[in-house]
Amino acid sequence: MQELEKRLEKKLQEYVSIIAEEYHEYIPESKKRFLKSITSFEKCISISDTGTISLFYRNNKIYLPKLAFLVLEQLKEHEQYGFDPNHKCYNEETIISNSNTFLDYINHAILKGLTPEEYYQENLLHEAMHFCGCGGANPLLEGITELKTRELAKKKGLITSGCGYPKEVEVVLRLQKIFGEKLINTIVFSDRTLSETVEAISGNEIASLYRTINVKMSESSYQYLTAKFDGKDAHIKKAQLYNKIDYSSVHELLDQYELNQMLSGKINLENEKGDVKWYHK
């Protein structure tokens, strides 16, 4: 176990370095000083009995579930286990936006014959993004973190699952398209609240929209985000509960916002090479 932790610590150190370089203009100085002060990542990762199958970040430490050993061991009983050792849940075209859920990830784990170390590695980049930025804690921030994880994985050829928070990523992609990448990048690394960050950059009206979206998403996913997925069937519980999340009210809100902005002349809709493109004046 210690050797495994050492390999993961080394990988985390690599990811932190990449993230710090890629997003240096968005990372607050206090966080930059903290990251530079780390002389060893030994205390930054722990494989523990966390009572859940999920990885999570808390107080400058990433917790990896020991439960993964039990869950992945029982998948070996499946007749298709290890059938495709090179299996991936995405390709270059679908890594950013896809409809994968944890059910797809379970299927991936079976086909690939996923080991606990591979499970940790495929989800470590997302946690490294938390380590360098915000702590998550709500579905909107998790979606923003996952989108940045996927974008970085695609750009740098890094390992990721491509299955984390797909419904949240769908919402964030719309927000990024409407309000721009700079705002989303700032949010993921901000040391202020979501509302304060958005208001400072885009004003109170848009901050109010973000607050409403955040509340709606939190209400829709409360049961999932507060659940502990434990036991040998933890992966099934997690997949089933996630499938119940419905953000249709959030998408309706964004539909109405885009329509209002277009009608008021604040957003133009033009056809460029056959593609519809939204942009702010």
Pin down the residues of each PLM region.
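Short, charged/polar micro-motifs that form catalytic or ligand-binding hotspots
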Residues: Q2, I110, L114-E122, C134-P139, ...
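Auxiliary, metal-adjacent structural segments of Zn-dependent hydrolase domains
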Residues: Q2-E118
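Hydrophobic face of amphipathic alpha-helices
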Residues: L4-E21, T149, D246, L254-E258, ...
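A broad structural signal for alpha-helix termini and local helix breaks/kinks
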Residues: Y23, I27, K31, A153-K156, ...
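Active-site recognition of the HExxH zinc-binding catalytic motif
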Residues: E118-G135, E146, R150
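Short alpha-helix boundary/capping elements
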Residues: A128, C132-G133, A153, F179, ...
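Post-HExxH zinc-binding segment in Zn-dependent metallohydrolases
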Residues: G136-F179
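Pan-zinc metallopeptidase signature
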Residues: P166-K281
